[in-house]
A protein has these predicted regions:
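Conserved H-D interstitial segment of serine endopeptidase catalytic domains
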Residues: 32-35, 81-137, 154, 330
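C-terminal segment of classical bacterial N-terminal signal peptides
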Residues: 19-28
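Chymotrypsin/trypsin-fold serine protease catalytic domain
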Residues: 140-143, 149-267
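Solvent-exposed adhesion/ligand-recognition segments of exported proteins
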Residues: 335-454
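Sec-dependent N-terminal signal peptides
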Residues: 8-18
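C-terminal subregion of chymotrypsin/trypsin-like serine protease catalytic domains
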Residues: 30-45, 63-102, 204-213, 218-223, ...
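N-terminal secretory signal peptides that target proteins for export/translocation
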Residues: 1-8
Length: 454
């Protein structure tokens, strides 16, 4: 008993020192990387307020989305390096939902890991992660659920789309616009690192949520992308939702317009600490839906040249599509909606109750409408072949270059590159794939009195 009490006190004191030390070090540190037309301060999500996207803190930092008052969906690689049963017992964890999450997390630490709804911070009492994520770490099957020990009744929840997006127009179709690519406008958000497009995620984490826009670049697999870009797959057939980060000036030497579309005014990309955050199909810019929908959870980012830095122009981000894991999410969602059957019965009799459809589950019906529902067929999960999908993948440097080429993912046919102007200063045979997860935070310096960690 004495040993467990001492360990608990040590954990608490260490956690408080770490949190307050980081707060002292986090001046001008920033999440989500904007293009060079915006600053990291300008994309702080002040207008979003407490919107159901929160920061996850355990041994590192990730982002997650509240899907009911007791459940958050996020990325498995944020937690799958330990047994799921460790969380909520020997490893404290929490989600905080304020735009500036630091006051809530400090309060959670200082009060023995206690939820505080007034500060929108909630202790985690259980975590479940997809075992399929263990095979590749963060590349496939990267989905997890966390339950909160106190209902987050004062925090909005999000609807989840469990159907694949309809295949959009592609090259050769009347009305296809390569500047818009798939035509699906998405929002990205998270609490991770920030920076600027030309330099990548040069700023650390400051516990604030940031947001940016992008176009959905493709639904395809890392195998299919790799086959086109450098002539070989890597045993990763599962489809992913992908976005790229376009240079609005089309002058960056590493920007190959990897998923065909042009830069948006407030375009951005993801960085370390944004893992688990939502890919949002927003109602304002998409005729498909009258409400914002979560399409996927962030797993990581890619760069394509050794001299290129992560989270900079020309890179991309990849998300786990929720429609591939609808059965896993529904089976492991700890929050149930129930109602009584007709007729008299005892309150304690389980046969007098029925499970109801979760009001935040969405599908696209046969008429093309987004409705409350659940898929009739089981999804493929990590077994998805990657042969189906959509979007256009490109090796398209700025300028009219002999080696530029694109491929229509849905047909497998060549597609015309869309860029012109500018100068190509590197060659396509330098392309190589580098992937990184986007969890974690900044490593701590050695503890001193001055930095508050001693």
């Amino acid at each position: 008993m004495t040993r467990s009490i001492n360990l608990h006190k040590l954990l608490l004191s260490t956690a408080i020192s770490t949190m307050f030390g980081l707060a002292a070090l986090s001046t001008n540190a920033y999440a989500v990387v904007p293009n060079d037309n915006n600053t990291a301060d300008e994309i702080i999500d002040e207008d979003g307020g407490v919107n159901g996207v929160g920061i996850f803190y355990a041994n590192g930092i990730c982002t997650g989305t509240l899907i009911n008052p007791r459940t958050v969906i996020f990325a498995a690689h944020c937690v799958n390096y330990r047994a799921a049963g460790d969380y909520g017992t020997s490893v404290p964890a929490a989600f905080a939902f304020e735009v500036d999450s630091l006051p809530g997390l400090q309060n959670w630490f200082a009060n023995n890991f206690t939820s505080n709804p007034e500060l929108f911070v909630y202790n985690v009492n259980e975590i479940i992660y997809n075992e399929d994520s263990l095979r590749t770490g963060f590349l496939e099957g990267d989905v997890a659920l966390a339950s909160l020990d106190t209902p987050a009744a004062n925090v909005p929840t999000w609807a989840l789309l469990f159907s694949p997006l309809p295949t959009p127009l592609g090259p050769g179709d009347t009305g296809y616009d390569p500047a818009l690519g798939t035509g699906y406008h998405v929002n990205i958000t998270g609490y991770g690192r920030s920076g600027i497009g030309s330099q990548g995620s040069i700023y650390g984490i400051d516990w604030r949520r940031r947001a940016a826009e992008n176009m959905l670049g493709a639904l395809t697999s890392l195998d299919a992308s790799g086959d086109f870009l450098y002539g070989g797959g890597s045993g990763l057939p599962q489809n992913l939702y992908l976005t790229d980060f376009d240079d609005p000036n089309q002058t960056n030497i590493y920007d190959i317009n990897v998923y065909q579309d042009d830069a948006l005014p407030n375009e951005g990309t993801t960085a370390g600490g944004d893992s688990g955050g939502p890919l949002i199909l927003d109602a304002e810019n998409n005729v498909l839906t009258a409400e914002d929908l979560v399409l996927g959870v962030l797993s990581g980012g890619s760069r394509y040249f050794n001299g290129q830095v992560f989270s900079s122009y020309g890179g991309s981000s990849f998300y786990q599509p929720l429609f591939l894991f609808s059965d896993y999410i529904a089976a492991n969602n700890p929050y149930r909606y129930v109602s009584t059957l007709e007729g008299d019965g005892d309150w304690e009799d389980p046969l007098h109750w029925q499970s109801d459809l979760d009001p935040n589950y969405r599908i696209i019906d046969s008429s093309g409408n987004v409705v409350n529902g659940f898929p009739e067929t089981q999804p493929f999960g990590v077994q998805d072949s990657g042969n189906s999908g959509f979007g256009v993948i490109c090796n398209d440097f700025s300028g009219d270059n002999a080696g530029d080429a694109c491929r229509d993912i849905s047909t497998g046919n060549p597609a015309p590159p869309s860029r012109n102007g500018g100068t190509d200063v590197i060659t396509s045979n330098e392309i190589t794939a580098n992937l990184e997860s986007q969890s974690g935070g900044d490593p701590l310096p050695s503890p001193t009195i001055d930095n508050g960690l001693a």
